[in-house]
Amino acid sequence: MTTTYCSKSWTDINIDFESRTLRHCCKAQGHSFPDQLTEQFISLGDVVKERRQQSLNNVAHSDCNSCWNDYSKGNSAYRDWANRWDDVFIKNHKTILNDDDKFIHYIEIKPDRTCDLACIYCSATSSSKIAQEEGVIIEDATNEDDYTVFKSWLKNYILRKDIIAEQIVIIFLGGEPTASERFYDLVDYIEDIAKLTDKKIRLEICTNANSKKFLMDKVITRMDTSKLAWGIGVSNEAFGEDAEGIRHGLDWSRFGENFKRYIQHPKTELIVLSPTINIFNLKSFHLYITWVYEQFKLYAPEKEFTWYGNFISWPDEMDISHLPKEYVKYIELAEHAIFKETDNKKHVYKENFVTFIDTMKQRLAASYNPDYKQVAQEFLERKQLVKKTDKLIKLMDSLDL
């Protein structure tokens, strides 16, 4: 059986309106829209059809170089925990996998890069705050016709009778999606479509949970009036001051208050904890995990939640593959924090998080650099110059064994 397939090639759409690019999987190579976007391009474009066919024939398609490059370095890759299919599924469905889009159910929308944070692993193309810091001008290629075509595709797709998934999940990315006016317009549109079908549709946001009160109130008010279930993806991976350093601009106290409001909301169906693992978060990761469990016990004991992590591969300086193997003790602390909560029935898909922890161990020290501390310090010093702060260097404490 082929070793190159991944369910993401069939189930995912990731559309970026500001840069006019489309991906099938957030880690895949992006492809520019044609001058005139078409519905065919969105879900059955030539490139993704080629990728699907090649991956079934054991060919490593260049779209997925992010994962292939990780494997070539001896690292674990996103595919290891993101792929949801196995050989039995492929065998039973192979006749319809080449030229079919009925498996799509995970639709990621990035309206723009408006953001209030300047995370040290992010870039100007994903954060307006970083672009402002660096004095970088990013071309906004937004085209109103693209939105018209996408809305038409989305409506036609949702109303189809042959869709296989029981639930369609529509995720808003950023930047910080709740700060984008486009977000509210699209939510209204999706709510209207949902009235025409009995399919289960969940709206989801990937948020930094750092919104000031006026914006947080606006999001909560929209959730209050929604007829759909919501998922809240929370982007964070560290605790307290470490989190504030990695996610420059974060207010940990405000994060905690917003986290509580999100998990307590009656329309919230699922909370997705989305840590981005890097050299500066390993030491406090177990503290963050413990804190998360405590929040649910105190404020939302009946709410389901899960973990869906990722690794930093860029900037390279923050990749845990360069650390020595002794740092495994911090991964083991994180593992212990999870196993302490074995009886928590509201932590769903727990096996996926256990697999992710295992891949952390595999990635650690895979490309060991004996000068990792010097590299990290120089990286932070460069960031401090741009961000006009002297506080980031405190993150070096996270590298104390």
Question: What is each of the regions a protein language model found here?
Answer:
Residues 226-233, 251-400:
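Conserved C-terminal portion of the radical SAM core fold
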Residues 1-145, 163-164, 351-401:
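N-terminal pre-core extensions flanking Radical SAM catalytic domains
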Residues 10, 24-27, 118-123, 181-186, ...:
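A short acidic (Asp/Glu
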Residues 153-157, 183-192, 216-221, 255-263, ...:
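Short, well-ordered amphipathic alpha-helices
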Residues 16, 221-222:
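Acidic/polar residues at beta-strand termini and the immediately following turn/coil
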Residues 17-19, 32-36, 196-199, 296-305, ...:
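Intrinsically disordered, low-complexity coil segments
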Residues 102-114, 125-152, 164-183, 193-215, ...:
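Core AdoMet radical
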